[in-house]
């Protein structure tokens, strides 16, 4: 009984430390932001001009660029991450092929972002430049689209890691019952697996979106290094 009380207190202290850490981060950001807030107000958030020489600091282009690249990357990554999750977690579950694929996914997740940035700059950007030429667009190669492609590759492993585990947790009895009524594998996935695992799949998507929002290095290397709001 005493050990159980101690265990609960230790868990409570651990939880309180996490909350306290988040609170301290927020307070630190707020305190260090006060000089900017006093000088610029909230104009910093909606200003469009970034010119340190004349003291103009508008973060709106960076905010919009972050949101655009993250949303586009998420749209690109969802079909691939969901397909691979079903492949690993359902079709080829616990097979050698799925284990090999899971290993590659884990390796992809730990590759430094600067490596993705260099690959995007020297390999993907020329491909995008060729595509822009064919579409009669300015052939820069570095753009929102290029950054979104890099981001989508970077966040796919995070969505897969969560989604495949949730898909594996779908009770076999539910699937066997559906098969016994003559349902096809596609129907089982559509009617049983995805509805059951939707919360976990959404959590994986949310995790990957957070990863995309927080990425800086790779995006900076391929987005074009321009502080203006894109018009196309």
Explain the meaning of each model-derived region.
Residues 25-34, 118-128, 210:
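A structural signal for multi-pass alpha-helical bundles of membrane permease subunits
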Residues 107, 115, 162-163, 179, ...:
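Transmembrane alpha-helices
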């Amino acid at each position: 009984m005493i050990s159980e009380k101690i265990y609960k207190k230790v868990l409570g202290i651990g939880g309180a430390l996490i909350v306290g850490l988040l609170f301290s981060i927020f307070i630190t950001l707020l305190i260090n932001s006060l000089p900017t807030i006093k000088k610029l107000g909230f104009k910093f958030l909606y200003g469009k001009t970034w010119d340190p020489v004349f003291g103009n600091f508008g973060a709106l282009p960076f905010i919009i660029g972050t949101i655009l690249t993250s949303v586009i990357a998420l749209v690109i990554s969802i079909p691939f991450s969901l397909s691979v999750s079903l492949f690993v977690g359902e079709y080829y579950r616990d097979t050698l092929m799925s284990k090999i694929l899971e290993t590659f996914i884990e390796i992809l997740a730990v590759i430094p972002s600067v490596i993705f940035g260099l690959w995007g700059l020297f390999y993907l950007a020329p491909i995008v430049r060729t595509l822009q030429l064919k579409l009669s667009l300015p052939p820069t190669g570095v753009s929102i689209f290029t950054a979104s492609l890099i981001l989508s590759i970077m966040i796919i492993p995070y969505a897969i890691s969560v989604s495949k585990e949730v898909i594996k947790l779908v009770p076999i009895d539910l699937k066997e019952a559906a098969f016994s009524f003559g349902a096809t594998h596609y129907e089982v996935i559509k009617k049983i697996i995805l509805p059951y695992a939707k919360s976990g799949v959404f959590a994986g998507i949310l995790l990957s979106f957070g990863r995309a929002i927080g990425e800086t290095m790779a995006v900076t290397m391929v987005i074009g290094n321009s502080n203006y709001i894109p018009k196309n």
